[in-house]
Swiss-Prot record:
Belongs to the ABC transporter superfamily. Lipid exporter (TC 3.A.1.106) family. Homodimer. It is a multi-pass membrane protein. Gene3D superfamilies: ABC transporter type 1, transmembrane domain (1.20.1560.10), P-loop containing nucleotide triphosphate hydrolases (3.40.50.300). SMART domains: AAA. It comes from Vibrio vulnificus (strain CMCP6). GO terms for cellular component: plasma membrane. Residues 28-310 form the ABC transmembrane type-1 domain. One of its GO terms (molecular function) is ATP binding. Its EC number is 7.5.2.6. The gene is msbA. This is ATP-dependent lipid A-core flippase.
Amino acid sequence: MSINTDESTWRTFKRLWTFIRLYKSGLAVAVVALIINAVSDTYMVSLLKPLLDEGFGSAESDFLRTLPLLVFGLMFIRGISSFVSTYCLSWVSGNVVMQVRRMVFNHYMQMPVSYFDKEKSGSLLSRITYDSEQVSAATSQALVSIVREGTSIIGLLVLMFYNSWQLSLVLILVAPVVAWAIGFVSKRFRKISKNMQTTMGIVTSSAEQMLKGHKVVLSYGGQEVEKSRFDVVSNQMRQQSMKLITAQAAANPIIQMIASIAIVVVLYLASVDTIKDQLTPGTFTVVFSAMFGLMRPLKALTNVTSQFQRGMAAAQTLFALVDLEPEKNTGTYSVERAKGEVNVKDISFTYEGAEKPALSHVSFDIPRGKTVALVGRSGSGKSTIANLFTRFYDVDSGEIQLDGVDVRDYELKNLRTQFALVSQNVHLFNDTIANNIAYAAGDKYSREDIERAAELAHAMEFISKMENGLDTMVGENGASLSGGQRQRVAIARALLRDAPVLILDEATSALDTESERAIQSALDELQKNKTVLVIAHRLSTIEKADQILVIDDGSVVERGSHSELIEKDGAYAQLHRIQFGEG
């Protein structure tokens, strides 16, 4: 178990090193500065021998006169090296964390929709924020301690053995015990760190859930429920933190106690006549001071074990994430602009983990420039069909063709440029209205194009009344706009894209009747040269569709034009009567 853990840590560090070595120049400068810092400390201890053996023994000693300048010089060098090492390692660490965050963020954007269906958004955010920051502990604080304290230990050991190898041999007996203690503590830190990462994700998810649903919380008086829920996860985080602190607090005195045994033995041996005769006051003081000085770096290395293991545990979690298979993009077919003919051939689809298929043997065609509407009760599978068009999910059987080519054979990015999507769940970015509209068009637009799209979507009616017009910031997810205004901005975004296939998933559901009429006139104009799939709740918006499909329980139960389906007096006619209060 321990061997596997050590191997895992080593593999993780090697992967992390691929990021660190990008900044090896800064790292090299920092390491040199740390070594100079440690050597300065060791040399300061070595000055005790000539000071005691020669300096105080001779009134004419030049050593005493030069000592103040020597000490000042050492402290100056130590100060400069400390600043350089701290700055350079912070620079390296900051860049490494930035690269790791970019890696995770970029991989998120390549993951399939099904991955986000399963993961809590709070946990995903925690990996970019908390876990990435923990990597900094392994690339800055930990490295500082490992290099500086490691060099100090080596320097002090050399100094001790040089002055009295007999007394220094005691450390050989103590060293294995110290090494075992540090190894034991490392494994404990690693386990606790992993638990802390998981708990931090839960804390973030709980807070995010409340913040996003604060209106629901206030409306239904759920403050106590949310408070109780957050208290539980916060306490779990506190418990994990206390476990880490307890392990760290216990490790320091244990290692110091082990080291103190060596000091006690040295004091005893120094009193033995055969050894005492070989010692001068300076020699004994140097050896004893060096041995006592080992306590600080040993304690620091114990503390850094906690930091290093937290960083390794976080890095392991992040690397496990980026090792997940991204969204499949095996298609190679590409076209600048599709004609827009869509054929759905006997498709079936089941969501991961679901027992019942969302769609079962669905077939229909949308000729170029025609409009097909999907209607049916909630959960019947209408939006699932739209998601399959753009390959947010892949069909289990059957195929969807665009211009006679299976959508799975298209290069994924190229396929999605052929579609413009407006759903009932509008997402706007914390940016200006203009940039939100232009988001769909990349850099292929002008200011006039944005204004024209906003005009067609009847968005300029409210935009023109704003002080900054199109340059108005909309807030997080369009918080400063009403539901209808957000919907019109989203429609303007789709209009600007000018894709050959338009998907309207309850696109007018958030609009009042007057706004809906205005939007519908713009959409009627837009649909003249485009293939359109409309998913609608309001049947009044799809009466002009070339074909209407009634979806129920994942299957097509009726199809035809509005008049044909009314005349048939089946499921569609029943929906129509319910919605319009007829009969």
